[in-house]
Regions:
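PLD/PLD-like phosphodiesterase catalytic module centered on the HKD motif
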Residues: 1-191
Length: 194
């Protein structure tokens, strides 16, 4: 027997499908434009990912919608340019999780949006890169829950745990060290291809 449920609370599968004109980016932008606050935890952020979301994030800055973004130095993939641009937005707190142990990576991909006590959470494979948000084959699930829902509570608690972890460094505290590591790694890769 089928059980009727409120469609607004039904989970959604979200992917990119250029044939149908569907992008993960559209779902994320829509949630950003309707939320009271947001928290994002992604392993990788690059210039193209910031550019994809820039206008929406600037609109949220104008409206005073606060957000937190947690990324990482894992694999030195996140581009300092993109981090600089995110940190320049006055409504966003940015932290970088410092992976000290090479065997203990940081590979999260979660977008949490809160509006009037309701969470809409997108979790899956999409980093904050243009290809992940618009063209790659990515699989994500959007969950909708009240603040009291067990799944939402678990996800929010895990975000808070990572956000408060001593390895999560503020942008101001860690960006110069990260920039040096990133440039060193980029130079090593460049020399390897010569």
């Amino acid at each position: 027997n089928a059980v009727n449920s409120n469609l607004a609370y039904s989970p959604q599968f979200i992917t990119n499908d250029y044939k149908r004109g569907v992008k993960i980016l559209t779902h994320i932008e829509n949630q950003l434009m309707h939320c009271d606050e947001f928290s994002i935890s992604v392993a990788f952020i690059n210039r193209s990912g910031f550019v994809e979301l820039a206008e929406t994030l600037k609109e949220l800055e104008r409206r005073g919608i606060r957000g937190r973004i947690l990324t990482t130095d894992y694999l030195c993939f996140s581009e300092p340019y993109a981090l600089d641009k995110l940190a320049s937005l006055t409504n966003i707190q940015l932290k970088i999780y410092h992976v000290k142990d090479k065997n203990n990576g940081f590979h999260t991909k979660g977008y949490l949006f809160r509006e009037n006590g309701i969470y809409r959470i997108i979790i899956g494979s999409a980093n904050m890169t243009q290809t992940a948000l618009s063209t790659n084959m990515e699989w994500n699930t959007q969950l909708v829950s009240t603040e009291q829902g067990e799944m939402a509570k678990s996800i929010v608690q895990e975000f808070e745990r990572l956000w408060k972890d001593e390895l999560s460094k503020s942008y101001d505290e860690f960006i110069e060290d990260y920039r040096k590591i990133y440039n060193r790694k980029k130079n090593q890769i460049g020399r390897a291809h010569v």
